[in-house]
């Protein structure tokens, strides 16, 4: 029998504190109300900041095994049900509706945060029009990545055979094929009955705006997740063995929000469709627990990325982003401890959404710092503890500056001048 404990908090009590690492459990509110807040709230919570019976507290930090992302205070006397991390697989088996409520709430939150990040960092709304597939094809054609262009043109034509750009897409598709570039049907339309899929390097798994009915688990190799914005490719993440992706389209039956392309090496994936997923909920609770952890990891990282958008100085943004990546990978900083990131300075600048006109100077400053070594496709930090300390120092200075601004804003004035 699943043994859950009840915890009481008096009105005004702190239940969670942002930044603390007490994340071995999460709570379900049984009675009462709880207010949540963040030090840097870039976007309002979709469900609001006042939680009540049936809502969850601390579930993202718990499932991601990362520090708390918010502070929670009891607005009234509250009774909470405590669920330990190790109990989650059993919760899936014994109380599937609660587990699925968490998964679907995570999926909705991810899409909401993804839309917010796109608006803030890329200065535009998420593309949902199928014609964006044609735009993606045009981009990869210009980049001479012909197989990727073929994939995008093919799926545009499949969805919009008589669309605005159909004739051009058809001509482009045939012209590329006439040069000898191969587009085997098993790559354009994988056999959905085959759960294990093997892709060669630089292959398209799915395209932004494409409809999707599967999530994927990487069994071997790496996958790059990106978007095409203003005729340039924005790298969102590099996923590795054991990682999952594509879950939002499966859970919400909505178009893909990003593009997935295999890295340079061969990649093997396990594809899970909706029917398999529904079976796995009851037969493989450990796998569903992993999916929940994956979603929690992504949401935690999105909140961190949103906070990163508020940092005004490019080099400080770059340090903060590297520290986020270390925490994502659960790498404990250490004096003289070296770490290699598998992306270069230009990709880091893209991840930080540094304006194009500032990128060259930001990279030059970044490379001048003593703990940084770099190649085109990797960054080596020679002392991760120093990186962590420098990031913390930058944050402290930002908080002090913010407090000064707030103080000046609150000063009494007489005809526009401070009263001393």
Task: For the regions a language model picked out, list residue spans one by one.
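Structural motif
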Residues: 33, 78-79, 222, 266-268, ...
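A small-molecule sensor/coupling module
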Residues: 68, 88-125, 256, 276-317, ...
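Extended, hydrophobic interaction surfaces within ordered domains
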Residues: 48-49, 53-61, 65-119, 125-179
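Cyclic-nucleotide recognition modules
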Residues: 46-103, 237-292
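Regulatory nucleotide-sensing modules
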Residues: 1-39, 177-232
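Alpha-helix N-cap/N′ positions at the starts of helices
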Residues: 7-10, 83, 125-135, 197-200, ...
